[in-house]
Regions:
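P-loop NTPase switch/communication element
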Residues: 1-38
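Short, low-complexity, polar/charged sequence segments that are solvent-exposed and flexible
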Residues: 17-20, 91-93, 120-124
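Conserved P-loop NTPase nucleotide-binding/switch module
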Residues: 16, 42-44, 48-102, 106
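Acidic side chains
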Residues: 2, 50-51, 118
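Conserved P-loop NTPase
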Residues: 99-128
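A broadly conserved detector of short glycine/acidic/proline-rich loop/turn motifs that flank catalytic sites
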Residues: 5, 29, 53, 107-108
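Switch/connector loops and helix/strand junctions flanking conserved nucleotide-binding motifs
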Residues: 7-10, 81-83, 109-113
């Protein structure tokens, strides 16, 4: 679900970035609505979204996860502590819904992996 054309870089409905074969891109659609639409009509194995943050988006993520769909999503923040200060996101990370948190920066170029944290094992795999 590419609400702001940040994942596939779509232009006139065509992905400009290689997001893989057998990938459908729903662009310029609010994430909460897009998630519900693809759940009802596409039977996805995985849903990827750009950054989440509001209660409607988080509710849609719970619906997808409860339906057995795997998720890859982003959250913007300065640190894990910054993100955990946001009530909605803290609930997501405190639950058993996500397994890993990957902290990225642009230190060595966009997408530099700084840290990987396993939420279930409560340990850092990389970076600490």
């Amino acid at each position: 679900i590419d609400e702001r054309n940040e994942i596939a870089g779509s232009y006139m409905g065509v992905a400009q970035l290689d997001v893989g074969m057998r990938t459908d891109v729903m662009e310029t659609c609010p994430k909460d609505l897009g998630i519900m639409m693809v759940l009802r009509s596409m039977s996805p194995n995985v849903i990827v979204t750009d950054e989440i943050g509001n209660e409607k988006e988080i509710k849609a993520l719970y619906t997808a996860l409860n339906g057995g769909v795997s998720l890859i999503t982003t959250v913007h923040g300065d640190s894990i502590e910054d993100i955990l200060h946001r009530t909605e996101l803290k609930r997501l990370l405190d639950g058993d819904l996500f397994r890993k948190v990957i902290i990225l920066s642009s230190r060595n170029g966009p997408g530099t992996i700084e840290k990987i944290y396993d939420l279930q094992e409560k340990r850092w795999y990389f970076g600490n």
